């Protein structure tokens, strides 16, 4: 356990999960670009004549091929243009809520007239956007770093107009504390936290259930969820909880990646991860008729484990965080929900890591639904296997001596082993941009 008291750890963990579990409309990488531009525009006194965007390679990879809400088009340049035209920075992750056809037409005209430029930038935080807005009299530079709505600095005509006090932010959040915990610590906090503090968990469950429902009805993205449902109705797929989790998670991702306006509750700052953590746990809870309190705690545990894993792998990385980090969170929550103790919870996580480690991130797009659906299904199966004492042995391959060692191994693989792979994937996925 951390040097902090258990009470303080519980308080910080709750703050962290609340901070990283918020509703969003649309993929959070285009959102980050639009939000940065919209924030910068507030400091302009006249018309914006030019927007120069610089983004991290991870923002570029994860934002270039995903449909912007209510548009049927993709592109970070379009996202930036919409941020200038109709973005409201006060709305945070809902910055796209006002998008309509008229605004889209104006954004397309801006792109046609080369008002917006987009370039990747090397050697920066994985979540990084710099937007330079130029007018007749003003030049405003807005810099976002470390989080999808975390504005770090605003420079107006060469003078710093706003700079975030990172020291106070560190003192208040100190998110790295979670790396000092074990999975057992997180599980104990999950069981001890006052249930009245977890009302926001139910909001996320209902929100993502509705997104999955809408995804099954609407022709969005890859339409994987509705296609899987049809196969199930034809008797070609089963009606077990693993298959239902696969279908619903795919449907939610279809909607989100396909530009649906339905809000999604995020996990670790990602809507797809929110779908992958919440929906499989909820499916199992409904199957076994778990109590509302058990469901809330299981989903909270899932969010916490997802954030724990991402402290090792990074917020955006070369591996598919939705399938792996969120999938690990889901299987941990399911194993706990099914009555598993630390052995079974850890075993479910090890089963997932032995299975899906190595699934690369090739950017956010419609086919993310396939990866999410795989992870959702495997999260259910891995938990049930662990409850039946089927657990991969220690010290084999990526699997270390403990579950924490294994997650650390995953982090090493991401940061040391896959760094070059991420560059290669960027060149493949974004060749027309870079």
Swiss-Prot record:
HAMAP family: UPF0597. The lineage of its organism: Bacteria, Bacillati, Bacillota, Clostridia, Eubacteriales. One of its GO terms (molecular function) is L-cysteine desulfhydrase activity. It holds the Pfam family SDH_alpha. This is UPF0597 protein CLK_1462. It comes from Clostridium botulinum (strain Loch Maree / Type A3). It comes from the Bacteria. PANTHER family: UPF0597 PROTEIN YHAM. GO terms for biological process: L-cysteine catabolic process to pyruvate.
